[in-house]
Amino acid sequence: MSEEIITESIVKNFGSAETSVGEKQPKRKRSEVRAEKLKARKLQKAAEIVQKQKENRKILKDVSLKRLSKSLDRSLPSENTIDQISFNHAMSEEDASGYQIGDKHKNLLLYKLSSSSGSVFTENLYSTIQEFLSAQKVDIADSKNTYVFGSTFDKKSHALVKTSDSVRSLKYGSFVKACAPLFRFASGIIKAHAPHFHQALLKLELAPSALRFGVFPNFSLQSVSNGYMSMESNFSSIKYGFVVIIIVGELNDVELKIPAISHSLKLKDGSILVLRSSLLHQWYSLPKQSILYEIRLFAMSSLWHYEKNKSIKIAKKDDI
């Protein structure tokens, strides 16, 4: 069963509604009963596959969440520092089928989905992104192009507000609509592999009339050019949360390096990563004249400082 089917099963198929004790249940058609049984089998199969993925997780015995979370407060590594690190690479068969990396306590750090899992969602997204950027009257290849959408907490007014980029209307609606299936897919992956964090995201109160992107309160779009560091940690979710990264572009020989765990991986159009926020320091290595667009789904760290959101409990060690 593919990851697309796994996620679809998790997102959509949750059995029939409960009925009150003593309430007479209406007679159901055979087709409805068969459909419900099929849903149950899909859910069971999906759960078995998720469990198998967890059991095959590669464990880093010298890495812990506690140590990694402290790296959020450090300065971003320089290009010279990156060059001095010996990076581990995934095998080609692992990259094709997908793999997971965990810390010494088996907590999920990185989930690289199979190389084909996101391509169905990004097939026409490259041109949609370029149309959006052109409408903003910016150079579509400029690595300074960074847009952050959704809710944030304004410390001066002590209120939840939309990010400044959320008010842009030119091509924004068509861009978000094109991304909607991708948002749902990413949310299903989080629900399967980080259920506690998924529930916490659903509980977050957002700015009035602000959109939710799947389960996430924020998403960003960033142009990435040669040797450009990815989004800084102050945009991340809380230390023990997750972000989902989706890569869009006509790519060849693109590498993403993650210094915190000395790991690197190859990227292509439709590559999807689930990443601990503690690992947000990343370094893209692109050939000259190349450009990719990074879509990131996350929860702004400021949201957790809003009074009504402070009470939301986050398990440091999710049941994953």
From Swiss-Prot:
Region (Disordered): 16-36
GO biological process, one term: ER-nucleus signaling pathway
Chief subcellular location: nucleus
Record flagged with keyword Chloroplast: no
Keywords of the record: Nucleus
Cellular compartment(s): Nucleus, Nucleolus
Function: Induces a stably inheritable state of calnexin independence called the Cin state when overexpressed.
Protein name: Calnexin-independence factor 1
